[in-house]
């Protein structure tokens, strides 16, 4: 019985040595893998123990495969949770635009960089998918709806897989409620804006977005970009329901301000009657100058709008 003691001690020593060897993961390697992949320190440590610090490629591959499994499992587990927060994005490139609505459970996640990166990724994949799309003739925006499973990111990953990985990382249920693209007729430029301005440097994001198809025959006193930004903000703030037609101008003396010395025999001025309850965009009082209609403001800058889109987070 006593003869077996050295063997028992040997097993104990061997197990302790193995455990100590497993713990020998350098802080530098752990931080490098964490920075490269974005996965948790716990999983990065597991990968380094399994493959060693000299085989980072295998460690990264293992992490991605593990994350995919965890992400799909977590996505299924969290799938019934309500997603009442999130952001809507709008990204444009000349005559093509993408509008994506991504929802999550909390405002905290909606404001995170990881959430915005995911929304940017989806938005850019929609834009890339839509750019070569041909459209029929007409003067209105043409709309296309895509399934997330038909989209890939710049690395060729299916966007459904990308979404599941993000759910696994962020630990919240997320749903993509709107995946749309818009194309304008040739020669027309699309512009977009958001409110509040919660997006990235490249992509406007917010609770509200608007998109307009703008033509400008010649440069006005402000740039097309600035003009479009003003109209987009008007659309977000005033919630027009249709484009409509320009209101008829009438000759009237009522448009003249009453002032001392005014000649009552002077020619009447041309004014536009503006209804404060108007829901057609072109006939609404322009938000930045209520004495003008939107149509009049556009006309003063040699511009016109062919169509527009307004989206609010959670709307149908």
Swiss-Prot record:
Residues 1-18 form a transit peptide. The gene is tsfm-1. Residues 245-269 are annotated as: Disordered. This is Elongation factor Ts, mitochondrial. Pfam families: EF-Ts_N, EF_TS. GO terms for biological process: mitochondrial translational elongation. GO terms for cellular component: mitochondrion. Belongs to the EF-Ts family. GO terms for molecular function: translation elongation factor activity. Associates with the EF-Tu.GDP complex and induces the exchange of GDP to GTP. It remains bound to the aminoacyl-tRNA.EF-Tu.GTP complex up to the GTP hydrolysis stage on the ribosome. InterPro entries: EF-Ts_dimer_sf, Transl_elong_EFTs/EF1B, Transl_elong_EFTs/EF1B_dimer, Transl_elong_Ts_CS, UBA-like_sf. The keyword Chaperone does not apply. It is found in: Mitochondrion. HAMAP family: EF_Ts. Keywords: Elongation factor, Mitochondrion, Protein biosynthesis, Transit peptide.
